[in-house]
Amino acid sequence: MDDKELLRKLAKKNLRACQLKQLEILKVIDGICKRNGIQYWLDSGTLLGAVRHGGFIPWDDDIDIVMPLGDLRRFERVAAKELPDGLFLQTTKTDPSAKEPIVKVRDLQSLYIEGGDNFVTPYKKGIYVDIFPFVAYPDLAPGLFHKVIPIISKSNSILHHFHRYSLRAFAEFFWFGAKLCAGWLMWGLLSLYPKKNRMGTAPLVNGTGNTHRRSSIFPLTTIRFEDSVFPAPADTDAYLRDLFGDYMQIPPADKRQVHAVYINPDLSR
């Protein structure tokens, strides 16, 4: 057994402890949002898990939620004051070397390592909950966004990935820099159209270009996830079909993979 496979086995062994720690982080976020009138809802695999499994997808090791952009900015301001000791609001401002422009609430007493992580830059690497910004999208055919938006998100991700100096890295900088500029230009042109009926994750962190009708999101409802109830979109069926198609279909065993390559849920032990 090679080192990578050994780490994967350890990650799976610690999966449930990781999930429970993420659930506790989510409960803290939920409390802050309720006290401050901040809207959010379960998204992506977390919402899918709630609908299909009543909680975590058994092999999933992350929690995703979304907030309208204005609510996320408010959350960043209040969370800096209200998060308890041991939790850290990770943004590009609070942790400039973070590998992604995604807001996360991280647990500082754990370690969660993914494939793209590095130990050259000192960003926080604890177990976390992802918080994605939701924005209005132009009232255009959804297929357009599937073509344009991944150009932005994937180019930006590659540009901000850790690179060692090399001719290839130099070439990637110019190639993906040009693609990122082209993607933003196309988004700017699309944004000239009215934005009344569709919303989605902000282009910079929307890897697929998926969007949703506002009517499938609002008014928010609630759904049980593990031992608690959290906000959810109004029409979970339509919302999940936008993301996954036939979302009730269980993937084959070889597709049920955790994201992490190493998980230590408690560094104090």
Question: PLM features: what roles do these ranges have?
Answer:
Residues 140-147:
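A short secondary-structure junction signal
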Residues 30-63, 67, 72-73, 242:
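Active-site nucleotide-donor binding segment shared across nucleotidyl transfer reactions
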Residues 61, 68, 96, 152, ...:
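Short, surface-exposed, charged/polar-biased interaction segments
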Residues 139, 151-158:
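N-terminal beta-rich core of secreted/periplasmic extracellular enzymes
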Residues 56-57, 71, 155, 263-268:
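Short amphipathic alpha-helical patches
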